[in-house]
């Protein structure tokens, strides 16, 4: 299997770094081919701009999604965007390794999504979205760490349900929207507080990596389950 790891943490010796390193070594030992984008080490530019396009169609007014569509057709994205898109097309499975900051991904990873998951590449009129999106046929897993304990992320917890509120906008709004099939996320709860917990999480993560092809997918509705007004059909409610 081709596995692409997108890693977003500024400290190489962090627990996130340990998880990334474990993923590389474990997956390689299992015979998978692995590519990594270490966004901080790459100094990946998170800010969308005109510089993302080598052959802009409108030099006077930047309509970003339109320029993305044009660049997708003309293969004229900046080299850093093209390189990341090529890794996505190469991959069968993508792992996103990051700390949960402000109930979401670090800004550098959000910028990566903004620039790389482009109109005309992962979604658009000619491509579709959700189950027909440009990255269909690929699976993706969020692997994240938190600063609050697990019970804070339950349906009645102070921080909100980790699946339905915290990670939904990433799993459904980004990954599934692009055509990918998100699987159940791996969450390490407050790993900074206890060394025994860190060791346990690494062992659990190692076991998860060994069963990569067997991780259950999140059961989102396909586009065909919705009406033209984007509401779920009665029979699927």
Regions found by a protein language model. Name each.
Residues 123-176:
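Short, glycine-/small-residue-rich phosphate/pyrophosphate-handling segment
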Residues 89, 107, 135, 180-181:
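Structured loop/turn residues at beta-strand edges in well-structured enzyme cores
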Residues 34, 182-183:
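Hydrophobic anchor at the start of a short beta-strand
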Residues 40, 131, 179:
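Glycine-rich, flexible loop/turn motifs
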Residues 1-98, 103-122, 195, 200-237:
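N-terminal beta1-alpha1-beta2 submodule of the flavodoxin-like/Rossmannoid cofactor-binding fold
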Residues 185-187:
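Beta-strand-loop-alpha "switch" segments that mediate conformational coupling across diverse proteins
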């Amino acid at each position: 299997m081709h596995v692409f790891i997108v890693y977003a943490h500024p400290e190489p010796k962090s627990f996130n770094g340990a998880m990334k390193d474990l993923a590389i070594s474990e997956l390689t030992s299992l015979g998978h081919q692995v590519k990594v984008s270490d966004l901080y080490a790459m100094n990946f530019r998170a800010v969308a701009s005109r510089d993302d396009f080598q052959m802009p169609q409108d030099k006077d007014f930047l309509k970003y999604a339109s320029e993305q569509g044009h660049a997708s057709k003309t293969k004229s994205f900046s080299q850093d965007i093209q390189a990341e898109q090529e890794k996505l097309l190469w991959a069968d499975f993508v792992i996103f390794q990051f700390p949960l900051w402000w109930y979401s991904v670090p800004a550098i990873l959000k910028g990566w999504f903004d620039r790389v998951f482009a109109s005309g590449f992962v979604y658009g009129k000619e491509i579709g979205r959700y189950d027909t999106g440009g990255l269909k046929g690929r699976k993706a897993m969020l692997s994240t760490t938190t600063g609050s304990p697990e019970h804070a992320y339950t349906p009645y917890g102070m921080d909100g349900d980790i699946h339905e509120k915290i990670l939904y906008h990433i799993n459904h709004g980004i990954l599934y929207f692009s055509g990918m099939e998100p699987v159940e996320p791996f969450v390490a709860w407050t790993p900074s507080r206890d060394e025994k917990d860190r060791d346990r999480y690494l062992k659990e993560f190692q076991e998860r990596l060994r069963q990569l092809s067997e991780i259950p997918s999140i059961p989102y509705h396909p586009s065909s389950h919705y009406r033209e007004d984007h509401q779920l059909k009665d029979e699927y409610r």
